[in-house]
């Protein structure tokens, strides 16, 4: 897997593009005007592993709230702007580290220029965002429907507007809820510009469908070397977006750190509540700072062999289970002590 070499862009304290680590993003779902609630959510995201946060800025009050929010958080903040160019200007003046706009809905060129001039003054990058759902009518007609080619043309038109105003601190985001259309659009745009790409499958759905669509789409793009920041968009608790993004990156070898839990799918030999045990293990290890693989297996017959690729694991039996390291049985443990035995082993693990 070779990553595309894109332009380096500074977003607050973080650099993206140019081979820098792929950053995980999410978006608050609080009212940005509610500073306390928004800060609390951002801090929770930060703890979960979010590295860049985006906030909706639909009002002047929200734009002005960014100044206080910025004082209390530790990760770069992106202001999401639609329609009113004055909100973009106010967001920059109040400390936004990046703004997300679609120049096509901000107004005429003079208004776009006012935003670009303010971004230049504060050295704030602009994310140019285009979604398939808001594709211009003329492009839909030109390509006979919503297509990857139309999405890319729309995005490049918006990029060109800002470039002609003398600014190139840009990030490009092109999204669709159609996985393969989204993949094709990113393949096309990567050939036509070298700005960092923020990738994701928009409106991907609930926890189940959203994770599947995002994993497939992001997995294909990341494997091709596309993407400098990612978001897994889910209808649900945004913290789950961050967990999923981390695991997608880790699964592709693009990120290390954090315990990976593997478990068997259960069968007729399973003698314990493996589903409950695996969930407890996953919750237990979330805050343990190790970069290892932990196996949770359902029987003592095949468990040791199946867990040999894990660094450590447990396998359940009738009333007792096994502690396993690298496929070797270390000791037998009472069933009710399996979880605590594993926890102690992890807490005493040599880093």
Language-model region placement:
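Active-site mouth loops of central-metabolism enzymes
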Residues: 19-37, 56, 75-83, 139-152, ...
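Glycine-rich phosphate-binding active-site loops on the catalytic face of alpha/beta enzymes
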Residues: 51, 95-109, 201, 224-238, ...
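Hydrophobic faces of well-ordered beta-strands that scaffold small-molecule active sites
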Residues: 22-28, 53-55, 77-81, 99-101, ...
């Amino acid at each position: 897997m070779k990553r595309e070499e894109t332009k380096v862009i500074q977003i607050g304290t973080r650099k993206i593009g140019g081979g820098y680590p792929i950053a995980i993003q999410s978006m608050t779902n609080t009212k940005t005007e509610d500073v306390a609630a928004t800060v609390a959510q951002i801090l929770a995201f930060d703890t979960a592993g979010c590295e860049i946060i985006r906030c909706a800025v639909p009002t002047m009050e929200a734009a002005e709230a960014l100044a206080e929010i910025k004082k209390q958080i530790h990760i770069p903040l992106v202001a999401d702007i639609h329609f009113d160019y004055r909100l973009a200007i106010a967001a920059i003046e109040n400390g936004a580290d990046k703004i997300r706009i679609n120049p096509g809905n901000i107004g005429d060129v003079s208004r776009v220029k006012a935003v670009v001039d303010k971004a230049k003054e504060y050295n704030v990058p602009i994310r140019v965002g285009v979604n398939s759902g808001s594709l211009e009518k003329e492009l839909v007609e030109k390509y006979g429907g919503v297509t990857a080619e139309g999405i890319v043309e729309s995005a490049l038109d918006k990029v060109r507007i800002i470039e002609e105003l003398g600014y190139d601190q840009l990030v490009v985001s092109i999204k669709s809820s159609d996985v393969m259309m989204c993949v094709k659009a990113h393949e096309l745009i990567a050939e036509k510009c070298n700005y960092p790409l923020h990738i994701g499958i928009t409106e991907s759905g609930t926890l189940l469908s959203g994770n599947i669509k995002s994993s497939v789409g992001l997995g294909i793009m990341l494997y091709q070397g596309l993407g400098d920041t990612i978001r897994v968009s889910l209808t649900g608790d945004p913290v789950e977006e961050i967990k999923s993004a981390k695991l997608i990156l880790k699964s592709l070898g693009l990120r290390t750190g954090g315990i990976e839990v593997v478990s068997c799918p259960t069968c007729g030999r399973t003698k314990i509540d493996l589903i409950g045990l695996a969930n407890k293990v996953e919750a237990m290890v979330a805050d343990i700072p190790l970069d290892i693989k932990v196996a949770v297996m359902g029987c003592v017959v095949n468990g040791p062999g199946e867990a040999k690729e894990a660094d450590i694991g447990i396998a359940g039996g009738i009333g007792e289970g096994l502690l396993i390291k690298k496929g070797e049985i270390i000791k037998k443990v009472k069933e009710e002590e399996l979880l605590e035995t594993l926890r102690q082993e992890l807490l005493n693990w040599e880093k």
